[in-house]
Amino acid sequence: MVADLTKGILKWKSRIEFDAVGSSSYYEELKGLPPLASHKKLTQAAIFNSTKYELLQVKKDILSIYEVVSRDIDEERNQMQQIELQLKKSLKKVEHSYKNVLKQRASTNCINGNDRLLANAEKKIGSLNEELACVNDIVSDIVNNLTALNANLPKKAQLLKDDSINVAHYPLLFDFLHKSCPKSIIATSEASIHENASPSPLLEHDELPAESINSFYGENELQSDSLAPLQTHDDNISSCKKILPPKFNTTSGPSIETNFENISADGLTYTKCSLKNSISLT
């Protein structure tokens, strides 16, 4: 039986045909592959030595990235600190304002606080009204005194006229007088009518030399300085009218200086007599 089995196997082997590897294409491709490296080159040290420059570059890149990131973090930290300081200052201001508002609300929240504020406002308004009334009284007194003094002067010597040079010198005063008491301002037409209606007595007499005038004024001044007894007001006016200053036909521009060209005879005599009366009263 064993002999029969061996015979059968041999017959089967004789029938099978094997293909050789050397004649296949795969074997040719296997031959084309490079040979394996040595085991010394496959160690860890050999592998890291071959990539040493790449490792150094990666290390440098990591360090530079770390520096940039750390710098950005420091800047952000500084900015956060500054913002925190500003927020603290703002918080202090807000707390201070809040405390002030609380105080104001506590002082004005109740009825007594509002009444106190109203009373203070009424006191201030009352004091302002009193001061305004005092100012109005003072101004009215000044205007009354000014108009009274102007009315006592002769018509030619009066200062409150529309055509007077004082209008240019004191525009605010004349504007105020026009608004407050327009009757105190003498119009130009009214003044001319009054002058034509009452001519000056100086035109009825002849002219006198200047020496007599100077001697007359010099004697009067000496008498006033020595405080001699004077006559009454009517006698003084009559005695002054007896000696009259000459007429001057020359004209000149407007002037504020007192001279014989811009002072009328009536105003001059009236002023002299008024001075004498004031000296006699004192």
From Swiss-Prot:
GO terms for biological process: endosome organization; regulation of protein localization. The keyword tRNA processing does not apply. Residues 64-140 form a coiled coil. One of its GO terms (cellular component) is BLOC-1 complex. Keywords: Coiled coil, Cytoplasm, Cytoplasmic vesicle, Transport, Vacuole. It is found in: Cytoplasmic vesicle; Cytoplasm; Vacuole. Its main location: cytoplasm. It comes from the Eukaryota. Component of the biogenesis of lysosome-related organelles complex-1 (BLOC-1) composed of at least BLI1, BLS1, CNL1, KXD1, SNN1 and VAB2. Interacts with VAC8. Component of the biogenesis of lysosome-related organelles complex-1 (BLOC-1) involved in endosomal cargo sorting. Belongs to the VAB2 family. This is Biogenesis of lysosome-related organelles complex 1 subunit VAB2. It comes from Saccharomyces cerevisiae (strain ATCC 204508 / S288c) (Baker's yeast).
